[in-house]
């Protein structure tokens, strides 16, 4: 990490920083060992008293450069005039005008270049673009070696890392193809793991970053930049489109690890200096196979959010997104959920939130209830969402958002989290509108005793003698032990002091304008909610409620009779046709003829079918057409209009009646919205 910045894993910057961002000192002048064709520039020396040599005296006027693409602390460099040094605690290197700088990690040479405050891989070593393997492989190595795994506070190369890299230098060849280079790092990473050289909170062995992830991080870090001052400190985001700024990996709470596991979230530690906001933070700890569906790593250190805002934003409505996956899975760290060309393009500020999941976020236990101070336990993931909303209230104005006009929305498990927040007194005043997409509400909330039984079952499966021992186990063991358990929200005498039924029927819930969305071929629980629970909610609410049946499905699948599946609306709301690939891989796209997963052949002739996971085949099979493009525009307009006004009616598109049990009115969202009657009869 960079000194002066916390390690919890606006205004436009000046031209000098933007110029530096166009370059990096991930130098391409030479390869490493194992096939490198260029030689390392030797260190300049002068005779030392008593014999031997030492670096040339630093009697030149020193200039300063900072590595773009992520400041690197502890990187070795030598100047032909100034001698040998390491980049300092802010990732800076110093040089004299006219000298040559050579960089290395211990004995592993990285390259050399004429000294300047901005060193570019495109101007050193003949690279054509940042996709040149010599550039990409250096990016992969440096980002992989970051000691604490948090690229938002820079890359830290410690002495231990430097020494072990030196011992493996001969095996590192920067001229290899990306896949081969990544594989070649396995022995080095195994040695670093064995030595305990990494300090991040993921107990799993460190793996090399992919070439795509490394290039994307470099692109974000070298884009135009923007500063925002928050209650925690100053953030530096990046230009995510010509009209938007984006800020990734913003901490809204302390890492819930060690003694903070299974406790209410704690306010984050502030930082001094500037914290970068260009790297995805970790996804919440969960089944490891699901990591591929999101960006960033995976660990308990996951209490971060992302903000996307128009460049000229001023007091715009705010939309806060909660991801699906029940209470156990998935992440908000996806490109579709943070698409700058989606909802934000319609005049809102969007926030996406990650929070604790599964047994780490939603179990209770008698010992936890005894220590909590409110006579209950559980709902830690929901408490995270409350703290994220508190962060939004305190900080979103700095990004151009209106803290008094906040809409929470989510799909599937995210919709369920929205409904839970509507029932919680802890969330009072933190949001002003709500959208539940395929969410489920069970009015008779799980009791504390029932939830504590799940916690006791987890303890037994862990073979732990005490709560202290449970807290000491790696998250990977906790997730594995909870594989057959079903943790979710419960009455806890704190976040939920009473059942959701009591909350609504006593009218103590957060009574805000509400829109419920269900898909034509949705799963049973959301259908049950829209048929039987939604009318009950409306009867106990003063605010207007609206209902939508989403029926649009991509053209290619529409032609095969596929009905809109669970999560099917997300491709439209987030202007992300590519998201149907994830939906398909999660077995959500159903063949009406068989009731099973839709079969997709080898449409591009590469020998791998869509059914076997070829993403190009899946997207081609979906076949988005002009009707889908229209549905995308309509969906974004409707969702953002509701966020702006509390009414989804859009002039010239749809005059949306509020739902009541008496009128039974809803809107079907196909290629064009149509007002209909008979929500209660849509599903048999």
Which stretches of residues belong to each language-model region?
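Feature for extracytoplasmic/surface-facing segments of secreted or surface-associated proteins
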Residues: 36-224
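Alpha/beta-hydrolase active-site loop
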Residues: 302, 374-397, 453
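Short glycine-enriched nucleophile-adjacent loop
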Residues: 415-427
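Alpha/beta-hydrolase fold nucleophile elbow
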Residues: 317, 400-411
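Substrate-access "cap/lid" subdomains that shape
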Residues: 290-293, 387-390, 394, 428, ...
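Non-catalytic accessory segments of hydrolases
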Residues: 221-376, 584-594, 601-602, 607-608, ...
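C-terminal subdomain of alpha/beta-hydrolase-fold enzymes, centered on the catalytic histidine
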Residues: 484-486, 490-684
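C-terminal motif of bacterial Sec signal peptides marking the signal peptidase cleavage site
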Residues: 27-29
């Amino acid at each position: 990490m960079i000194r002066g910045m916390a390690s919890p894993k606006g205004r436009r910057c000046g031209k000098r920083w933007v110029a530096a961002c166009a370059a990096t000192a991930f130098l391409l002048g030479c390869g490493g060992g194992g096939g490198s064709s260029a030689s390392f520039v030797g260190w300049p020396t002068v005779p030392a008293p008593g014999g031997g040599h030492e670096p040339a005296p630093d009697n030149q006027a020193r200039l300063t450069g900072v590595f773009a693409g992520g400041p690197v602390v502890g990187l070795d460099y030598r100047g032909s005039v100034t001698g040998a040094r390491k980049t300092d605690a802010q990732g800076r290197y110093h040089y004299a005008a006219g000298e040559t700088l050579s960089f290395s990690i211990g004995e592993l040479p990285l390259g050399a270049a004429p000294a300047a405050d901005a060193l570019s891989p495109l101007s050193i070593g003949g690279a054509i673009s940042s996709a040149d393997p010599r550039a990409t492989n250096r990016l992969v190595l440096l980002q992989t070696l970051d000691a604490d795994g948090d690229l938002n506070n820079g890359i830290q190369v410690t002495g231990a890392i430097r020494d072990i890299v030196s011992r493996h230098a001969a095996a590192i060849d920067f001229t290899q193809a990306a896949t081969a280079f990544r594989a070649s790092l396995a022995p080095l990473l195994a040695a670093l793991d064995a030595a305990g050289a990494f300090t991040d909170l993921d107990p799993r062995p460190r793996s090399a970053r992919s070439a795509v992830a490394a290039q994307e991080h470099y692109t974000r870090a070298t884009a135009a930049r923007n500063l925002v001052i928050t209650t925690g400190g100053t953030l530096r985001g990046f230009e995510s489109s010509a009209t938007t700024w984006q800020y990734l990996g913003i901490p809204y709470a302390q890492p819930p690890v060690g003694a903070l596991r299974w406790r209410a979230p704690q306010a984050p530690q502030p930082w001094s200096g500037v914290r970068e906001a260009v790297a995805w933070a970790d996804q919440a700890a969960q089944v490891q196979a699901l990591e591929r569906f999101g960006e960033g790593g995976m660990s308990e250190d996951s209490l971060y959010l992302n903000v996307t805002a128009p460049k000229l934003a001023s007091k715009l409505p705010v939309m806060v997104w909660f991801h699906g996956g029940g209470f156990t899975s998935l992440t908000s760290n996806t490109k579709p959920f943070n698409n700058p060309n989606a909802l934000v393009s319609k005049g809102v500020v969007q926030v996406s939130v990650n929070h604790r999941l599964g047994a780490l976020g939603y179990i209770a236990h008698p010992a936890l209830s005894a220590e909590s101070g409110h006579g209950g336990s559980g709902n830690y993931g929901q408490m995270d969402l409350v703290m994220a909303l508190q962060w939004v209230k305190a900080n979103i104005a700095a990004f151009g958002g209106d803290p008094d006009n906040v809409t929470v929305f989510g799909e599937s498990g995210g919709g369920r989290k929205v409904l839970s927040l509507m029932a919680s007194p802890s969330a009072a005043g933190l949001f002003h509108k709500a959208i539940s997409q395929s969410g489920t509400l069970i009015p008779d909330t799980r009791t504390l005793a029932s939830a504590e039984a799940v916690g006791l079952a987890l303890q037994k499966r862990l073979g732990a003698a005490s709560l202290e021992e449970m807290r000491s186990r790696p998250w990977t063991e906790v997730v594995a032990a909870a594989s057959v358990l079903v943790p979710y929200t419960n009455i806890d005498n704190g976040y939920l002091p009473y059942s959701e039924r009591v909350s609504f029927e006593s009218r103590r819930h957060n009574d805000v304008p509400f829109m419920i969305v269900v898909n034509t071929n949705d799963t049973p629980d959301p259908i049950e909610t829209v048929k039987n629970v939604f009318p009950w909610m409306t009867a106990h609410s003063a605010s207007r409620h609206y209902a939508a049946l989403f029926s649009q499905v991509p053209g290619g699948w529409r032609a095969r009779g596929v009905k809109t599946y669970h999560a099917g609306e997300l491709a439209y709301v987030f202007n992300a046709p590519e998201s149907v690939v994830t939906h398909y891989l999660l077995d959500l796209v159903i063949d009406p003829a068989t009731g099973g997963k839709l079969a997709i052949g080898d449409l591009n002739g590469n020998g791998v079918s869509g059914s076997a996971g070829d993403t190009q085949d899946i997207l081609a099979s979906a076949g988005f057409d002009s009707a889908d493009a229209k549905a995308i525009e309509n969906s974004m307009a409707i969702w953002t209009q509701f966020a702006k006004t509390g009414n989804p009616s859009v002039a010239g598109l749809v005059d949306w009646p509020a739902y009541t049990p008496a009128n039974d009115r809803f809107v079907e969202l196909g290629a064009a919205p149509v007002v209909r009657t008979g929500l209660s009869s849509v599903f048999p």
